[in-house]
């Protein structure tokens, strides 16, 4: 039975919303607004035509992680061109800004859009980057991108994604990711692509240790990731926890998503507090807001009410998230006067804050309207 701490008052909620923070674990396709999913779907006469947002909210109830992964593909189906990617990025930034998010690294499964619908890489990244530029101008949120490979696809496809990451570095791409169903598909299957990208300066930030155990985390650590998506099942093996500590790896933990997909049966069983107490670096992420009903702030609330985090812990977690941002994501981004972030610890290069102008090299965005596809 989950323990519940009362006291999430409006004052505390407002305080946490005001903490400058980074969102480092959110999937673009899983962060569409329900109305946008329906709008894009109706445009193409898709599977949700004629259904409303209430039905959509009730629709996504998952039997297990694999069931979730199957339903997730629904969210990728509605993207048809660069304008759809731009719209999704702009709207996500609009949703993140009131939650105190000043910087976001957003994961996009570009390889899925390419394989399933034939979208060229340049159209995908043009839409993402146009959205990032509009988001900066409109919401003040700095958005960068992780292009993830899907484990069900081949090692050759992963190499293609790695090549795209290198090509996209000047247009907001900061890392290679790895997602999808973990069991039987460890990170080491994609070693060639990961190492090829690393040789060209692209870091690897895979999901590991969510649907698979501590061994998946150990396997991923072979590639020296600065962060791991989820990773909390490292707690099953003290030696793996020690490895996280030795390397300073940050875990992007998403409590609501872990509960919804059934990888934890009850938040009281979630090991994130134990890991943090051991000294493991932890940040919180909303993962897939559309599918889980999560936000950046709900994860902070879950941590407070169910995972034993104090208000001071939440503030420290917000600071940690800024310090865990990837260096490539923040050139030209400056400290806001009066802010005491990011922390100087962990070798964070330079000051990071809100960019005061569109990033150097940003493309003109007037040709991509966020309201309709072209």
Show the residue positions of the predicted features.
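Metal-cofactor-binding active-site regions of metalloenzymes
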Residues: 1-202, 211-216, 222-227, 232-250, ...
């Amino acid at each position: 039975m989950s323990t519940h701490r009362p006291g999430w008052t409006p004052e505390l909620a407002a305080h946490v919303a005001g903490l400058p923070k980074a969102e480092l674990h959110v999937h673009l396709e899983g962060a569409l607004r329900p109305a946008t999913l329906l709008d894009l779907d109706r445009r193409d006469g898709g599977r949700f035509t004629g259904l409303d947002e209430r039905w959509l909210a009730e629709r996504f109830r998952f039997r297990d992680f694999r069931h979730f992964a199957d339903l997730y593909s629904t969210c990728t189906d509605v993207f048809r061109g660069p304008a759809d990617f731009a719209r999704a990025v702009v709207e996500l930034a609009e949703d993140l800004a009131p939650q105190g998010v000043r910087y976001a690294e957003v994961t996009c499964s570009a390889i899925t859009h390419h394989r399933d619908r034939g979208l060229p890489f340049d159209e995908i990244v043009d839409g993402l980057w146009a959205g990032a530029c509009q988001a900066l101008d409109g919401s003040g949120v700095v958005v960068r991108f992780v292009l993830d490979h899907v484990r069900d696809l081949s090692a050759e496809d992963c190499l293609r994604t790695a090549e795209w990451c290198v090509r996209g570095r000047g247009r907001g791409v900061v890392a290679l990711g790895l997602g999808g169903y973990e069991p039987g598909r460890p990170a080491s299957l994609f070693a060639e692509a990961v190492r090829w990208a690393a040789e060209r300066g692209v870091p690897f930030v895979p999901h590991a240790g969510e649907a698979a155990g501590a061994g998946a985390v150990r396997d991923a650590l072979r590639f020296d990731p600065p962060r791991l998506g989820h990773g909390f099942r490292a707690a099953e093996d003290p030696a793996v926890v020690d490895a996280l500590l030795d390397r300073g790896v940050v875990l992007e933990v998403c409590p609501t998503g872990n509960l919804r997909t059934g990888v934890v049966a009850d938040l009281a069983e979630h090991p994130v507090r134990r890991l943090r107490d051991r000294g493991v670096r932890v940040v919180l992420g909303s993962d897939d807001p559309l599918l889980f009903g999560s936000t950046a702030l709900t994860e902070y609330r879950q941590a407070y009410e169910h995972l034993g985090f104090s208000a001071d812990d939440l503030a420290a977690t917000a600071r940690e998230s800024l310090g865990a941002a990837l260096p490539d994501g923040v050139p030209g981004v400056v400290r806001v006067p009066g802010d005491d972030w990011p922390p100087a610890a962990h070798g964070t290069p330079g000051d990071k804050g809100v960019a005061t102008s569109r990033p150097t090299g940003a493309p003109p965005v007037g040709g991509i309207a966020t309201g309709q596809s072209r």
